[in-house]
Structures are given as structure tokens and as C-alpha cells.
Amino acid sequence: MTLACLPQTQCPLQRQVSLAKFTTLNVGGCAEWLVEPRTIPELQAAYIWAQEEGLPITVLGAGSNLLVSDRGVPGLVISTKHLRYLTTDLETGQLTVGAGYPLPKLAHHTAKLGWRGLEWVVGIPGTVGGAVVMNAGAHGSCTAQRLVSAVILEPDGTLAVVAARELGYAYRTSNLQETQRLVLQATWQLEPGHDPAQVKAETQKHLSDRLRTQPYGFPNCGSVFRNPQGWTAGWLIEQTGLKGYQIGHAQVSEKHANFILNCGGATAMDVYHLIRYVQTAVADRWAVWLHPEVKLIGNFA
């Protein structure tokens, strides 16, 4: 199969593209096929084409919170990074954003408007689509608290507007995970009318707190493990003596133990083996099994 563009579009269809540059960990093999749609119709066309060809579909936003196998990803990988549109409704205080819009940029934009509600997303290295799927959260807030609805591309290729209450939200999860339902845009309910200077200051404080406590000098995927009930994953890992522990070129961060760093030249298998080692060591010490927040994509057998 040799195609320059998706059928009926001007959207380039690329073959055997390294995904390392599409992830915040800078690891991973090649996508069998890769497409970077700039519009919702192009994304629909990509989805329908993959279904017609019998290809599995993987969606990437900012490439955080995921680990791509060194063996690559079969089928079609859809990058949403160009779906970055944003509209505001000044009367209702609602904000509608494309799935590829970066969360830090969104926080700064709403702060400039004097709209409260998304100050906490400023330090999350992800996109709107990923936040909706994962119920991203920080500083005691999460996506589900402000989300009104999402536009979903359903498995049959149709679009549906789905209310937030129908997305089955819980801690760092939704019923969109492990499905072929794709988030295309989200509408949030914010609180307009505040002093922009004050909202900017609060946003900057959240960012400063994250920069002070979390590692940003090396590639990483964000928090690796979910916090078990009654515990924090970082504390458990630190108390197990694993800060700085390294397999290959992947290392448990000295600054925050719930982060794994690519210290230069790490492979996805280095990271994977380190994740498994940490899980086993913590379970042996505390009888607590750490469940990954990071999503594994591809074959790690």
C-alpha cells in the first residue's frame, strides 16, 4: 500500500515514522503509518480509512503519560497536535478547545482573560484530549470538575456531544480509556470576571510549585504511578530507597521519585524494566502494588 495523502484529503500519510520525537520521554520505535490532521474532517477521514483497511488506531496528543515500545506501533497513529483551536463565550464563561491544545498554554490564556478554573493545568505537559481521557489532575483539582462536555468520534465514524457526567470519571480515569472513542474537543465551564493579574499570579504559583518539586531537566513522561489509596506513590518509592536507581539510561528521579527520567539514550525497555522493578520492590516492602498512570503502547513482551 503506497499513499501520499489520505483518500479525499490533502493530509499527508507517512510510513515508518519514529515516534520518539512525538513523546516527552523521547523513546519508542516507529509508527507503521502516521497522520497529523489539521481539521476534524481530516481526522474523521483518517479514522474511517484505518477502519476500512483493518488497521488498529492509536492517538497521540503531547506524548506525555505514555511509553511507546521500541518495536513500534502497528496500524495508524493519529497525532492531534495540530487541533489547537479555541473559542470563548463571554456570556456563559464557557471555553471550547481542540483536543491538541496544550494545557500550559490553555492555563496562561485563561489567566490573561481573568477566568478562574484552570490555573492548576499550567504544569501538566499534556493536551486537552489527553486530559479528558485520563481525567488529568493536580493541586486538588481535576478535569471532571470543570468539564461540561466533549465531542467524541465514535467507532462508527460519527460525531457525538457527550456530557461530562456520562464519561464515567474517577481518579485518573474515564470510560474513554481502552476504547476506540476519540476526543476531538472539550467545553469547560470557567469563572470569568476576575482580576487577570490575580489569576496570573495564582497560575504562576502553581507552575513554580511544580518546577520546585518535579524534574524538568531530562525527558520524562510525567507521574509514572497512580497514588494508592491512603498513600502517595512518590513517598513509597522514596522510602523504598529507589531515588536515583537506574536501569540502562532510565533513572528514578532524585527530585521526585514518581518520575522516571531518560538520562540520554534510554530505550523504552529500560523504562519498562525500571517500572516493573519499582513495582516489585515497593510491593515487597509495603505490600502495596503501584498501578501505572503511564500508558504502555505496543509490545513489551
From Swiss-Prot:
Named cofactor requirement(s): FAD
Q: Cellular location of this protein?
A: Cytoplasm
PANTHER family from the UniProt entry? UDP-N-ACETYLENOLPYRUVOYLGLUCOSAMINE REDUCTASE (PTHR21071:SF4)
Q: Which Pfam families match?
A: FAD_binding_4 (PF01565), MurB_C (PF02873)
What are the alphabetically sorted keywords of the record? Answer: Cell cycle, Cell division, Cell shape, Cell wall biogenesis/degradation, Cytoplasm, FAD, Flavoprotein, NADP, Oxidoreductase, Peptidoglycan synthesis
Spell out the protein name for this chain. UDP-N-acetylenolpyruvoylglucosamine reductase
- Catalyses which reaction(s): UDP-N-acetyl-alpha-D-muramate + NADP(+) = UDP-N-acetyl-3-O-(1-carboxyvinyl)-alpha-D-glucosamine + NADPH + H(+)
Question: EC top class, in one word?
Answer: oxidoreductase
EC number in record: 1.3.1.98
Which InterPro entries does this chain map to?
A: FAD-bd_PCMH (IPR016166), FAD-bd_PCMH-like_sf (IPR036318), FAD-bd_PCMH_sub1 (IPR016167), FAD-bd_PCMH_sub2 (IPR016169), MurB (IPR003170), MurB_C (IPR011601), MurB_C_sf (IPR036635), Oxid_FAD_bind_N (IPR006094)
Positions annotated as active site in the UniProt record? R172, S223, E293
Q: Which family does it belong to?
A: Belongs to the MurB family.
Give coiled-coil spans as residue ranges: none
Q: Which GO terms describe its cellular component?
A: cytosol
One GO biological-process annotation of the entry reads:
regulation of cell shape
The annotated pathway is: Cell wall biogenesis; peptidoglycan biosynthesis
Q: What is its main location?
A: cytoplasm
Q: What does this protein do?
A: Cell wall formation.
